[in-house]
Amino acid sequence: MLYDRFGRPVTNLRISLTQECNYRCFFCHREGQRFLAKNELTPEEIERLVRIASRLGIRKVKLTGGEPTVREDILEIVKRIKPYVIDLSMTTNGSRLKELAKPLAKAGLDRVNVSLHSLKPEVYKRITGVDGLEAVLEGIEEAVKYLSPVKLNMTVMKGLNDGEIWDMVEFAAKTGTILQLIELEAPREMAETAFFRKYFYPLKPVEEKLEKLAVETKERRMHRRKKYFIPTDYGIAEVEVVRAMHNTVFCANCTRLRVTSDGKFKTCLLRNNDLIDFLSAMRNGASDEEIVEIFKRAVLMREPYWK
């Protein structure tokens, strides 16, 4: 297993498969990738990377984007990398889950996170730029059958969907999904912009209310986040709160190494001066051991953003 200079183990790989997306969410951080990548990793290159990572103790992989399901070879990618990992998941907008949930599960995907920022069609369209709520809800229904546990990612934004938090808690209970309430996040230089101030909605008061309502709480090892079990008319809802801004505990317990869609290691979502190219080495005939050394160099560059 690899450890960074701060004693944090690296156990998770978060791979952006593409920067292409069929949605236009106005707040999207694009996994920290600022520019559209035209040189995407091939399925063979992704498989090789994950195989090497598994030798280093990295056995959990999350596929992201952009929107990973817009890649026509998504099933091949999943099938290729599953033998090397114990937990293979994906973050998706859910637009193609109705047709893909079962094939993805058959290919080896274990579970999904679905971005669901509103249950109101007009608000959903305003946030995502797409009139696609109904298709996503149908996709979630299919995902629950084949890719459980399904997590719903709701980025809470002031004046847009902050009034839907408790409706979403009930929806999670009703559908048997797990709700993640997520604060808007941004690098330091963006946190004082008019955009951020307009939409940032602090979740601390919400978490305090969840604490009071919960019939049970647990703590996740990842980021030391609490899980709240909330009684509703539809049964118990499982709710997590992601508050990354200025959260030193969140960063101190990060175990992720990110991979950009154009073949670079990225040590932190909020940094852009930390990219380490491995794809050029791969395509120029580098051995597995040489890729391992690039892995190690990337891990040693990791440091908590908030500390």
Swiss-Prot record:
<dbReference type="InterPro" id="IPR007197">
    <property type="entry name" value="rSAM"/>
</dbReference>
<feature type="binding site">
    <location>
        <position position="62"/>
    </location>
    <ligand>
        <name>GTP</name>
    </ligand>
</feature>
<feature type="binding site">
    <location>
        <position position="25"/>
    </location>
    <ligand>
        <name>[4Fe-4S] cluster 1</name>
    </ligand>
</feature>
<dbReference type="InterPro" id="IPR050105">
    <property type="entry name" value="MoCo_biosynth_MoaA/MoaC"/>
</dbReference>
<protein>
    <recommendedName>
        <fullName>Probable GTP 3',8-cyclase</fullName>
        <ecNumber>4.1.99.22</ecNumber>
    </recommendedName>
</protein>
<keyword id="KW-0004">4Fe-4S</keyword>
<dbReference type="Pfam" id="PF04055">
    <property type="entry name" value="Radical_SAM"/>
</dbReference>
<feature type="binding site">
    <location>
        <position position="21"/>
    </location>
    <ligand>
        <name>[4Fe-4S] cluster 1</name>
    </ligand>
</feature>
<feature type="binding site">
    <location>
        <position position="66"/>
    </location>
    <ligand>
        <name>S-adenosyl-L-methionine</name>
    </ligand>
</feature>
<feature type="binding site">
    <location>
        <position position="28"/>
    </location>
    <ligand>
        <name>[4Fe-4S] cluster 1</name>
    </ligand>
</feature>
<comment type="similarity">
    <text>Belongs to the radical SAM superfamily. MoaA family.</text>
</comment>
<dbReference type="GO" id="GO:0005525">
    <property type="term" value="F:GTP binding"/>
</dbReference>
<dbReference type="InterPro" id="IPR013785">
    <property type="entry name" value="Aldolase_TIM"/>
</dbReference>
<feature type="binding site">
    <location>
        <position position="190"/>
    </location>
    <ligand>
        <name>S-adenosyl-L-methionine</name>
    </ligand>
</feature>
<keyword id="KW-0408">Iron</keyword>
<keyword id="KW-0411">Iron-sulfur</keyword>
<feature type="binding site">
    <location>
        <position position="151"/>
    </location>
    <ligand>
        <name>GTP</name>
    </ligand>
</feature>
<dbReference type="GO" id="GO:1904047">
    <property type="term" value="F:S-adenosyl-L-methionine binding"/>
</dbReference>
<keyword id="KW-0479">Metal-binding</keyword>
<keyword id="KW-0342">GTP-binding</keyword>
<dbReference type="Pfam" id="PF13353">
    <property type="entry name" value="Fer4_12"/>
</dbReference>
<feature type="domain" description="Radical SAM core">
    <location>
        <begin position="5"/>
        <end position="231"/>
    </location>
</feature>
<feature type="binding site">
    <location>
        <position position="251"/>
    </location>
    <ligand>
        <name>[4Fe-4S] cluster 2</name>
    </ligand>
</feature>
<comment type="pathway">
    <text>Cofactor biosynthesis; molybdopterin biosynthesis.</text>
</comment>
<dbReference type="Pfam" id="PF06463">
    <property type="entry name" value="Mob_synth_C"/>
</dbReference>
<feature type="binding site">
    <location>
        <position position="254"/>
    </location>
    <ligand>
        <name>[4Fe-4S] cluster 2</name>
    </ligand>
</feature>
<dbReference type="GO" id="GO:0006777">
    <property type="term" value="P:Mo-molybdopterin cofactor biosynthetic process"/>
</dbReference>
<dbReference type="GO" id="GO:0051539">
    <property type="term" value="F:4 iron, 4 sulfur cluster binding"/>
</dbReference>
<keyword id="KW-0456">Lyase</keyword>
<keyword id="KW-0949">S-adenosyl-L-methionine</keyword>
<keyword id="KW-0547">Nucleotide-binding</keyword>
<feature type="binding site">
    <location>
        <position position="14"/>
    </location>
    <ligand>
        <name>GTP</name>
    </ligand>
</feature>
<dbReference type="InterPro" id="IPR013485">
    <property type="entry name" value="MoaA_arc"/>
</dbReference>
<feature type="binding site">
    <location>
        <position position="91"/>
    </location>
    <ligand>
        <name>GTP</name>
    </ligand>
</feature>
<dbReference type="InterPro" id="IPR010505">
    <property type="entry name" value="MoaA_twitch"/>
</dbReference>
<dbReference type="InterPro" id="IPR006638">
    <property type="entry name" value="Elp3/MiaA/NifB-like_rSAM"/>
</dbReference>
<comment type="function">
    <text>Catalyzes the cyclization of GTP to (8S)-3',8-cyclo-7,8-dihydroguanosine 5'-triphosphate.</text>
</comment>
<feature type="binding site">
    <location>
        <begin position="256"/>
        <end position="258"/>
    </location>
    <ligand>
        <name>GTP</name>
    </ligand>
</feature>
<dbReference type="GO" id="GO:0061799">
    <property type="term" value="F:cyclic pyranopterin monophosphate synthase activity"/>
</dbReference>
<dbReference type="GO" id="GO:0046872">
    <property type="term" value="F:metal ion binding"/>
</dbReference>
<dbReference type="GO" id="GO:0061798">
    <property type="term" value="F:GTP 3',8'-cyclase activity"/>
</dbReference>
<keyword id="KW-0501">Molybdenum cofactor biosynthesis</keyword>
